[in-house]
Amino acid sequence: MCFLEGKLRKLEKSTGEPGEEGFQFQVSDDGDYNQRHYEALGDVITEYVYDLLETEVGLVRLPVPVNPDHPSTFIFASPNALTADAPLVILVHGSGVVRAGQWARSLIINDSLQSGTQIPYIKKAREMGYEVLITNSNENSKVINGKRIAIKGSSNAVAHVSYVWKNYIQGAKSNQVLIVAHSYGGHCIVELAREMFPSFKSKVVAVAMTDSVHRLSSKHAMEKYAKFLSLASRNWVSSDLPLDEPESTREGEIPRVSAGTVKHELTSWSCLQSVFAFFEAALRRTRRHDDL
């Protein structure tokens, strides 16, 4: 298997070159073998996307925890993400097997790198002069000497996002933080806002969620962090309505609009242009306020 023009293709046996045939899950009558084959391919894709983050879009690795113990993990950022005063885009994926740089492994395998990875978001942000930092919230433990050990600062997704905020984003020069959070990533951001509200409010300009699974209940509605999120955020949800059409939203919740697709995993890709238009509008409002 290899990627050709961003799409996974099977190699032709006769030529060794990529053909027209895409990934096939069923390569054997043994269901367990097929699953192991799929998971092994997923592991290769993770490393391939990591390489693209460094070679194609020029990101660098930052350790988690900051002073690496064993075990440890890493996030990715543009070289000047922590020192530039330009807007800083934070990307937070959902739960499951995805790692930094991915929105949906199934899309990478069955559709394309464009729809399944965060690379289009990174390229768009860099084109607009923004810095970028992407989290890696699903790498929570490592096996060392046969024993699974939790990673300090990354024992679960919520802890990972909190650690990255406290140790990297909070001290970054930029006070124009823009967040994109997909699915469970939205829950992580809600928890971050609740835990770190003073610094969150001082740095965050806008939050774009894509089919977020968070929940702001009525008991939260009067809390400051919930009010801030409801004003500064928008949630693009899977829907059969046209892109950006308003969806029903409970009182006190983050406003919901259509992502222009009924597929959960496609929401981030489908609403990319709308997300950046939302960010630009939020930045303009901030700049006008600063000029007063």
Residue ranges with predicted function:
Residues G16, A81-T83, S95-V97, E139-N140, ...:
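Conserved beta-strand elements of beta-rich interaction domains across eukaryotes
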Residues G116-I119, K123, E127, S137-N175:
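Alpha/beta-hydrolase active-site loop
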Residues M1-S72, A84:
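N-terminal targeting or regulatory segments adjacent to alpha/beta-hydrolase or S9 domains
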Residues G101-S106, S137-N138, N145-K147, E191-E195, ...:
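Short coil/turn segments at secondary-structure boundaries
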Residues I179-I189, V207:
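Gly/Ala-rich beta-loop-alpha elbow adjacent to hydrolase catalytic centers
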Residues A86-V89, Q176-L178, A206:
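Structural motif
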Residues R61-K142:
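Short, surface-exposed "cap/lid" segments of acyl-processing enzymes
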Residues M196-L292:
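The feature captures the conserved acid-bearing segment of alpha/beta-hydrolase catalytic domains
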